[in-house]
A protein has these predicted regions:
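Phosphate-binding/catalytic loop of phosphoryl-transfer enzymes
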Residues: 1-54
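ATP-binding/phosphotransfer module of carbohydrate and carboxylate kinases, centering on a glycine-rich
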Residues: 40-170
Length: 170
């Protein structure tokens, strides 16, 4: 869970199942892009709580045209949409932000994780900045689904380096 999202079922030696990811436009539930899409839509429609609407406007100073240009005309709109995670972290005590994140995680569990038949037989592992920085909320939502998380890493590269060091391939 980072800019985007994906999942797979790994049996300890290979990936045996992979739920299709529909990308930032139709899917990426639980990701920064998914949260950003929902947040920015509410911002543009002025559906955010008033205090949060004003704080975001003050912090980012984006106009409607700036946002629409970034999403429809500039490269990597998913990265733009995911770029507001720091704002969410800074405003986590706001109920809207808390619900934005936990609802996005719930959608990830429903549309991705719950699709694996034997998912409750294995611990879950997550990689990505969104999973890492919102770890307590991810644990909370996984508990709602009676699922156990065993590891959350900010980046897969540290685990790859650890693997190669242990197996002396570096």
């Amino acid at each position: 869970l980072g800019t985007g999202s994906n999942s797979c079922y790994y049996d300890g030696s290979k990936i045996v199942n992979n739920v299709v990811s529909l990308g930032y436009f139709f899917g990426d539930e639980g990701s920064g892009a998914h949260m950003g899409k929902n947040f920015i839509k509410d911002y543009l429609l002025e559906n955010l709580p008033e205090k949060l609407q004003e704080k975001f406007k003050k912090d980012y100073n984006y106009t409607r045209d700036n946002i629409l240009d970034a999403v429809y005309n500039l490269p990597f709109p998913n990265r733009f949409l995911a770029s507001f995670c720091e704002f969410y972290a800074d405003n986590l005590s706001d109920k809207y932000i808390f619900d934005l994140i936990t609802d996005s995680f719930r959608e990830f569990f429903l549309n991705q994780v719950e699709k694996y038949k034997k998912i409750r037989e294995v611990p879950l592992r997550f990689t990505g900045s969104v999973a890492f920085y919102f770890e307590p909320l991810l644990h909370q939502v996984s508990n709602e689904f009676n699922l156990k998380i065993s590891r959350i890493m900010r980046s897969p590269f540290s685990a790859l380096a650890e693997y190669h060091k242990t197996n002396k391939t570096i």
